[in-house]
Amino acid sequence: MRFLTFLLLAALPFGVAAQKKSDPVWPSFNIDSKTELISYNEVPEVSGATASELYDRTMKWGSDYYKNFGEKVRKQDKEAGEIEIFARFPIYAYDKKGVKTASQQGLIQYTLTILFKDGRYKLEITKLNHKEVSYQPLELWLDKADPDAVNHAFYLTDIDAEMKTVISSLKAALADSGDAGGDDW
């Protein structure tokens, strides 16, 4: 009987440790001081490229990157050097173990604005919101005291990864002059 009691007490910490949930990982976001919205901002330099060339490269990138790019372009002004893109992508639910499922939880919408000057461009992603039955700004999901905070942390991590993918893809496309370096016929 003593042995059984000892065995039970020895196994108890393992059962308790197995029930512990790890804290969710929250991505760090840049919050614009004026608008108080989540934003991604960069001003990369592209030496030797004119504003017009950067504009053309962006239009090519957009048609390659987005499905139905023409529907996503809200503003395109080559003379002023500005393109505004309104895009969206789906987010998916996570189960209790933190594994992504195939169940769609709505769409995330964002506005990508790109301004061009000779040798550089400014990209800004802002106005991120969750579209389901109604629109919900993602800034509400930053509340770690929210009852659904664990799911919000998963969603925000996915959203941050998607935004960084958009930015890196755009930067790679604009840095590439498109010259194949082949024979000039």
Model-derived segments and spans:
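Ser/Thr-rich, low-complexity intrinsically disordered terminal regions
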Residues: 19-185
